UniProtKB/Swiss-Prot annotation:
Protein name, entry field: UPF0102 protein RALTA_A3032
Signal peptide bounds: none
Species of provenance: Cupriavidus taiwanensis (strain DSM 17343 / BCRC 17206 / CCUG 44338 / CIP 107171 / LMG 19424 / R1) (Ralstonia taiwanensis (strain LMG 19424))
Region Disordered: start-end pairs: 1-21
Source lineage: Bacteria, Pseudomonadati, Pseudomonadota, Betaproteobacteria, Burkholderiales
Pfam annotation, one family: UPF0102
Length: 131
């Protein structure tokens, strides 16, 4: 009979993703942003973190983690299709609000030895998501 010991296994993809989001969230809070929603999902889209900047701007954050810089690293892994899914989810989220605040799309790119916060990483118009 084969046995499996979780203590020697690597964390699941979902667990690694949650750890990356925790790390990104902690960094953004240190920069003065406050969490609004985590893992917002709708049909066809998802947002890892929705934060509020000190000036009231709503910040939609995509968190990307890579084990190395191959293929351009974490930031390069955000394809136009992924941007469209984030924008779609952001539009869905904004439709639930009584008043739409200023918004932006940021990326937190995590690699083993660094964290990079890319503010205004992309915009809704350039992402090409339909209304």
């Amino acid at each position: 009979m084969m046995r499996s010991f979780k203590s020697t296994q690597e964390p699941s993809r979902q667990a690694r993703g949650a750890q990356a989001e925790d790390r990104a969230l902690a960094h953004l809070r240190r920069q003065g942003l406050e969490p609004v929603v985590r893992n917002y999902r709708c049909k066809g889209g998802e947002i890892d973190l929705v934060m509020r900047a000190p000036d009231g701007t709503l910040v939609f954050v995509e968190v990307r983690q890579r084990s190395g810089r191959g293929f351009g690293g974490a930031a390069a892994s955000i394809t136009p299709a992924k941007q469209r899914r984030v924008v779609l989810a952001a539009r869905h989220y904004l439709a639930t609000l009584a008043r739409v605040p200023p918004c932006r799309f940021d990326v937190v790119a995590l690699e083993p030895d660094r964290l990079e916060w890319l503010q205004h990483a992309f915009d809704a118009d350039a992402a090409g998501a339909g209304s």
